[in-house]
Design a protein with these regions (language model features):
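Conserved phosphate-binding elements of NTP-dependent enzyme cores
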Residues: 1-942
Length: 942
């Protein structure tokens, strides 16, 4: 290999905050890029190297194909040499599609379907007996053998347990010359006027021929009649001895000889929940159905229906007919639309919700007569169900969003497949049962089942099993043994979906590729981290270059080469501070090196907080893998929940406790996982879940609008003398309202180019040059800065700029306090990472007036944070705890765990081997626990 191709050489990289840097990255090695959050790590790895790799790939397409992709912009870099094909494995949650599962993403389910299509056995749904299939020759031989010298009838089963009068069928059969049929066990002549009871279920077998085996029946006649019967019965025939009521069935398909129940031979799509051939008819292969929940119908029972008390009516536009029917129902009970909801009796509500078809006599006392009231109303719930099923209007979407809950499909019990697909089994398990096994159990089952195959099936299954086992092992190697193939992709964390993609890439066995990963250690316990590092080394050892953006100490120390970018974030970063082998970090003069060598550290508190003596107690939590857990959260403390990936931390906190609290305080829709009872809810006055979901989904949303300070900034600009002269109000300085904004881009600063089947592309508006406002608005300046200049400021600059204005200053200061000084005020929320979005939410909470009695829940807040940023974040959190608030943090980061006042360790392992609280107490108590794996790693840290 020549010298020039031993490195990926980047010259003059200026993307985002990069300061025209040159860097040589060794190929076929594991290289870690580290540095403070916002220092430019992702700008180098993803926005420069990956973007250029992707652009070069698209350049290879034909001009015709490129017109649909649009010109991918060349990153701001002079040149990059020695670049291999690039694959980026990012943290983004893979798929919000409810049909996507771990099995479909990894393609393991496709191989499993193939395995079941080729080597499974079918069993009868009624008798449980194994189904058999025959060839035509075997059927003929069996008939000759079993019915020697007997008089028999050959029949074609055409209807099996179905309702209908079947008049057309009998007319058709009579025209073809067939004279008799066995209908519901009775032999009947076929007449042109024959009609059955249409509301009863029937079995109909057409008599095709009569034989005396060995005498009247010639070989040629038997073969011809048998073929006719087979065609008519779709592979199934029946044989009945004359004078007997018993019938014996034979099938080319799989069949139960007792009942005649028949199944087609399986194909891979027999087991696909995305194909009509395999999916459950009721839920269409989703495993869940949406059910209307009346608990969400009424928020304030003191209001009447006239005052908007019955919420679904607010979402239904054409509600005049419904209102008239409800009015009639209430009139029967002597009530009206002005009656408070709490005074409406249960019987009346039953009529309103589920319908009524009756006539009532209503006495009109004042007139001394009675009045007839006829009610013919299907009910509010059936009306809503019909609207939701059609999904043709926006109101249907609103009704589904506001008034339904997701329930397991009662037909398939969540298996997603038809009963016939679940009749096929290998070693007693159907495909849905195997799909529901944890990956570690699946490995055991495959090893066990291999030895039980017949010689023929062993040969057929050999290659399929090899593929399944190889891919499965890669998933186990990246610490995902607790997941099952049936787990829905939308429930995976960013870290889990990234590791699934990593395992899929390792499974593809590509070589000479540059892999770029974004913090693969997210969501991993220290123990699983070691397995992940080995997987990355494996990827390197087969002949690939691996570039990892990472803050994890173990990952940095295990790398072949480390790049440290800094020195600070935003415009104060973007330089290569140090590059070399991890062992030489001792001599480096950077913040990262100081934390790794121990010169800087996050100090362990001298005393742990006592809390306020109150607590929230959750009893009997059994959701997912939880084993009847009793959880006590002491209040007024920093509580950290730890445990192996998949041990049940999220099920306990995000799946059970948070939905209970959210329902109690805010009447939220999400149902908690099963539990027995909860105590102590009155010990807090509100609950805040600071998660990593985006703060906005369009480029119009930004930190200034989310925190609410943009309103104050607009008010400030409207109070300036220039604005007063021109008559500008605060709305003039909004980019969402006509008047002050640029009308070409409607205040977006960007124009959206729709790409039909591809994601939309955003380009700068040529009229305002991305400034969002028109020329007149930009002429109004405060301290020499226009409203657009203010949005372009970093938070650090805004802190100095707005010092004289307390209201705005307080809000920008909290953003600076959580370590976000490097982002700009108007940065599009779509470009913020999950960790940044989470800290903006935290800053917004910090800026609010404190009641000192709030419970905050954070899930892995250190995602994307450097050691120094973790310190800043924990200082901000501790400020809130000092004010009397309580925190529950789910975290694997030892720097956070060691600061806890109280630790709850869930385990001992992931999946079915987890789901218990194995240790609780202060960090000092946890490190003494023999059971706690977290304690073992925490001991090293402390």
């Amino acid at each position: 290999m020549s010298k020039s191709t031993e490195y990926i050489e980047v010259y003059g990289a200026r993307e985002h905050n990069l300061k025209n840097i040159n860097v040589k990255i060794p190929r076929n090695e594991l290289v870690v890029i580290t540095g403070l959050s916002g220092s430019g790590k992702s700008s180098l790895a993803f926005d420069t190297i990956f973007a250029e790799g992707q652009r070069r790939y698209i350049e290879t397409f034909s001009a015709y194909a490129r017109q649909f992709l649009g010109g991918l912009e060349r990153p701001d870099v002079d040149k990059i040499e020695g670049l291999s094909p690039v694959i980026a494995i990012e943290q983004k949650t893979t798929n919000k599609n409810p049909r996507s599962t771990v099995g479909t993403v990894t393609e393991l389910y496709d191989y499993l379907r193939l395995l079941y299509a080729r080597v499974s056995d079918a069993y009868s749904q009624t008798t449980g007996k194994k189904l058999v299939s025959y060839t035509e020759d075997q059927i003929l031989d069996a008939i000759k053998e079993n019915y020697k010298n007997e008089k028999i009838m050959l029949m074609a089963p055409v209807v099996r347990s179905r309702k209908g009068h079947y008049h057309e069928l009998f007319v058709q059969m009579a025209k073809k010359g067939y004279g008799q049929a066995r209908i519901d066990g009775e032999l009947t002549d076929i007449e042109y006027d024959l009609k059955l009871d249409r509301y009863k279920t029937h079995d109909i077998d057409i008599v095709i021929d009569r034989w005396i085996i060995g005498e009247s029946a010639s070989e040629a006649r038997m073969e011809k009649s048998l073929r006719t019967a087979m065609d008519m019965g779709e592979g199934l025939i029946g044989i009945q001895k004359l004078g007997s009521t018993e019938i014996e069935y034979f099938s080319k398909n799989l069949m139960d000889a007792e009942t005649g129940h028949s199944l087609a031979l399986p194909e891979p799509n027999t087991f696909s929940f995305n194909s009509p051939k395999g999916s459950c008819q009721s839920c269409k292969g989703l495993g869940t159905i949406k059910k209307i929940n009346t608990d969400y119908f009424v928020e304030n029972p003191k209001l009447s229906i006239n005052q908007g008390g019955l919420l679904p009516l607010e979402d239904i536009k054409s509600n005049k007919y419904i209102l008239s029917q409800i009015k009639n129902i209430l009139e029967i009970f002597g009530l009206g639309l002005a009656t408070p909801f709490k005074d409406i009796p249960e019987e009346a509500l039953d009529y309103i919700y589920h319908g009524c078809n009756k006539e009532f006599n209503k006495d009109l006392k004042y007139a001394g007569i009675s009045k007839k009231i006829k009610i013919n109303f299907d009910g509010l719930i059936p009306f809503m169900e019909e609207l939701i099923e059609e999904r043709e209007s926006y109101e249907a979407i609103l009704l589904e969003r506001h008034f339904t809950t997701e329930e397991t499909c009662p037909e398939c019990k969540g298996a997603r497949l038809q009963p016939s697909s679940l009749s096929f089994k290998i070693d007693g398990k159907n495909i849905a049962e195997v799909n529901g096994l944890s990956l570690s159990d699946l490995k055991e089952w495959l090893a066990d089942v291999k030895d039980k195959f017949s010689e023929k099936n062993s040969i057929i299954a050999h290659e399929i099993l090899k593929e399944i086992e190889t891919r499965l092992q890669f998933l186990l190697d990246v610490g995902l043994d607790y997941l099952s193939l049936s787990r829905s992709s939308k429930t995976l964390s960013g870290g889990e979906s990234q590791r699934i993609r990593l395992a899929t890439q390792i499974g593809s066995q590509l070589v000479n590729v540059l892999y770029i990963l974004d913090e693969p250690s997210i969501g991993l316990h220290q123990r699983d981290n070691e397995r992940l590092i080995n997987s990355l080394k494996n990827l390197r050892d087969i002949g690939n270059s691996v570039l990892v953006v990472e803050h994890d100490k173990d990952m940095i120390m295990e790398a072949d080469e480390v790049l440290d970018i800094g020195p600070r974030a935003g415009k104060f970063g973007g330089e290569i501070l140090w590059q070399g082998k991890p062992k030489d970090l001792l001599n480096a003069d950077t913040i990262t090196a100081d934390y790794i060598t121990g010169k800087r550290k996050i100090a362990i508190p001298e005393v742990r907080r006592e809390g306020n003596g109150k607590s929230i107690v959750l009893k009997g939590a059994t959701g997912n893998n939880l084993k009847n857990v009793n959880l006590e959260i002491p209040l007024g403390k920093l509580v950290v929940v730890t445990g192996i990936s998949g041990s049940g931390k999220s099920s306990l906190i995000n799946g059970t406790l948070y939905p209970i609290l959210n329902k109690h305080f805010y009447r939220a829709v999400q149902e908690p996982l099963p539990y027995k009872k909860v105590e102590g809810l009155d010990n807090i006055d509100k609950i805040v879940d600071v998660d990593q979901t985006p703060i906005g989904r369009t480029p119009r949303s930004n930190p200034a609008t989310y925190t609410g300070m943009f309103t104050d900034i607009r008010n400030l600009f409207s109070e300036l003398p220039e604005s007063k002269i021109r008559g500008y109000k605060p709305g003039r300085f909004s980019f969402n309202v006509k008047g002050g904004r640029c009308e070409t881009c409607q205040g977006g600063g960007l124009k959206v180019i729709e790409m039909n089947f591809l994601p939309d592309v955003y380009v700068h508006c040529e009229t305002c040059n991305g400034k969002r406002f028109n020329r007149e608005t930009l002429e109004v300046r405060y301290k020499g800065k226009s409203i657009s200049d203010v949005l372009d400021m970093t938070i650090d600059e805004a802190v100095d700029f707005f010092q004289p204005i307390p209201k705005i200053f307080a809000r920008v200061k909290t953003l600076q306090d959580v370590g976000l000084g490097y982002i700009t005020m108007g940065q599009q929320s779509t470009t913020l990472s999950g960790g940044e979005a989470q800290r903006i939410k935290l800053a917004t909470e910090l800026a609010k007036r404190q009641t000192g009695n709030t419970l905050y829940i954070l899930d892995e807040p250190t995602t994307g944070l450097h050691f120094e940023d973790v310190k800043i974040l924990m200082d901000a959190i501790n400020k809130l705890v000092e004010l009397g608030n309580s925190f529950i943090i789910i975290e694997h980061n030892m720097d956070v765990i060691k600061l806890a006042d109280h630790i709850i360790d869930v385990g001992p392992e992931g999946g079915k081997y987890g789901g218990e609280i194995i240790a609780k107490g202060t960090p000092e108590e946890i490190i003494k626990s023999k059971k706690s794996l977290t304690g073992k790693y925490l001991k090293k840290e402390m």
